[in-house]
Amino acid sequence: LLVDAGCSLTDYYNGDITRTIPISGKFSQEQKVIYEIVLSAQKTAIKSALIGSNSSTVHNVALKVLIEGLKEIGLLSGSTEEIIEHQLYKHLYMHRTGHWLGLDVHDVGAYRMGEYEVPLRNGMILTVEPGIYISDRIPVPEGQPIIDEKWKGIGIRIEDDILINDTNPEVLSLSLIHI
């Protein structure tokens, strides 16, 4: 069960989290493997959310971890650079890794100013929410492995709210458990 929940606090600021919970009470072996890949991508991406970095850097860090994990279990093949360049991962991960968070759950604000990425600054808040979604309804790109039945129907996303500050990124939703 994938639960994407938001809330508005009394000061009008918002929170936005996603957790994936096994309906049976326990992840299958395949679900656990996918969960661990997504969790690793999220943790690595959060570490990259530093002052002066930008949302694309955070996204690309998560994307590389996802791709490496998917290659390791045989759901993607080829070099990571080629997979990214030709977007050969899009049938398994079709969105960006996060968005601004503030007075709106998907807060306003540009990610680019002309040809430059907006740098992360002290006090900014963004979400970090990588995911993997394995469907038999989305065509597998030519040259990529056919998806084994054991993986089909698995969808995992983990989202937390991250405050950019002077030292290290702070996970504001830290009190919410990860399964």
What annotation goes with each model-predicted range?
Residues L1-I177:
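Active-site neighborhoods and metal-handling regions in enzymes and metal-associated proteins
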